């Protein structure tokens, strides 16, 4: 009697996420290439850093970062890494991450109102 080993088949999923950094890039607060490299080095696949392989591709335009994945990938994890980058660059007090639609995030400035009367 021979025993066959059951293999798990991973679903092929095509996911695409975008991070719109247009406001901070126009103000030259964030370098988009540096942010893309940060994501490439910090995304974990299979519990290992930088193990992207062909499963996850990260590309950047002038003001946007595109993340394409063929394995299950959480949008929330992308938000976590974005917040981690902002904290590392000491920008967390000025910028926040918000969801603009189902597959994208946007970096925005906090609205700081100063009292002009004083």
UniProtKB/Swiss-Prot annotation:
**Signal peptide coordinates:** none
Q: Which GO terms describe its molecular function?
A: RNA binding; structural constituent of ribosome
Superkingdom per UniProt: Eukaryota
Q: Which InterPro entries match?
A: Ribosomal_eL22, Ribosomal_eL22_sf
Q: What is this protein called?
A: Large ribosomal subunit protein eL22
Stored Pfam families: Ribosomal_L22e (PF01776)
Query: Does this UniProt record's set of keywords contain Ligase?
Result: no
Which family does the entry's similarity section mention?
Belongs to the eukaryotic ribosomal protein eL22 family.
**Does the keyword Ligase belong to this entry?**
no
Cellular component terms per the entry's GO annotation:
ribonucleoprotein complex; ribosome
> Which biological process terms from the Gene Ontology are attached to this UniProt entry?
cytoplasmic translation
């Amino acid at each position: 009697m021979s025993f066959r080993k059951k293999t798990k088949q991973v679903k092929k999923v095509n996911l695409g996420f975008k991070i719109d950094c247009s406001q901070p890039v126009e103000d030259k607060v964030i370098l988009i290439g540096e942010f893309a490299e940060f994501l490439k080095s910090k995304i974990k696949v299979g519990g290992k850093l930088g193990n992207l392989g062909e499963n996850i591709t990260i590309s950047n335009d002038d003001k946007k970062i595109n993340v394409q994945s063929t394995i299950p990938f959480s949008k929330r994890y992308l938000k976590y890494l974005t917040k981690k980058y902002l904290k590392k660059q000491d920008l967390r007090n000025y910028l926040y991450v918000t969801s603009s639609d189902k597959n994208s995030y946007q970096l925005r400035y906090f609205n700081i109102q100063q009292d002009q009367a004083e």
